[in-house]
Design a protein with these regions (language model features):
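C-terminal end segment of the histidine kinase catalytic
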Residues: 171-176
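Two-component histidine phosphotransfer core
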Residues: 1-158, 163-169
Length: 176
């Protein structure tokens, strides 16, 4: 889909096509990094923004994003590519399946000594539009959290009739 979007932009909007190629390249580079590597919350949010900018080309105004971020947490440590798959799931299983689109809400807050990240998206009204998937991204995130934090971190999925919510909790640490 992304490559088709780029191809369609090359003649009409070459600067935008170039930007999408750069965004996609940065996402590819990030995906090649060792999965146990720590980065900052700010860097993870940057990858989410790159991904959402690419999806915005495909979905246009159907994709709305609401960022609710505690700026004091931006320099906290976070495993590389732990948040972007949650945002991707929200777009793929939620927004893209709804003809009129919807809003992805991304929240970042602190609860005691924990970072709490929430990602919410609307649920398609038609049962035929719901794509359950294989939960590979969620299983991968749970395994990584367990390996890095043992029982101090959690991924909580709350499917609802109207809203699908995912909450990621992990210890707040500074990047060493």
């Amino acid at each position: 889909n992304t490559m088709n979007s780029i191809a369609s932009l090359i003649d009409s909007r070459p600067e935008q096509a170039e930007q999408v190629v750069e965004d996609l390249s940065e996402l590819f580079r990030a995906s090649l990094v060792e999965s146990s590597r720590q980065t900052t919350v700010a860097d993870e949010l940057h990858l989410c923004r790159l991904y959402l900018r690419i999806e915005q080309l495909r979905l246009g105004e159907r994709l709305q994003v609401d960022w609710q971020l505690d700026e004091d947490l931006l320099d906290s440590a976070m495993p590389s590519l732990i948040l972007q798959p949650l945002v991707e799931n929200a777009v793929y299983h939620g927004i893209a399946q709804i003809p009129e689109g919807g809003r992805v809400c991304i929240r970042l807050s602190c609860a005691g000594n924990s970072i709490v990240v929430g990602v919410e998206n609307p649920v398609p009204a038609s049962p035929a539009a719901v794509t359950n998937g294989h939960h590979m991204a969620l299983d991968n995130i749970r395994q990584r959290l367990r390996a890095l934090y043992d029982d101090e971190a959690a991924l909580i999925v709350t499917p609802g009739a109207d809203v699908h919510a995912v909450e990621l909790r992990m210890p707040r640490e500074r990047l060493a």
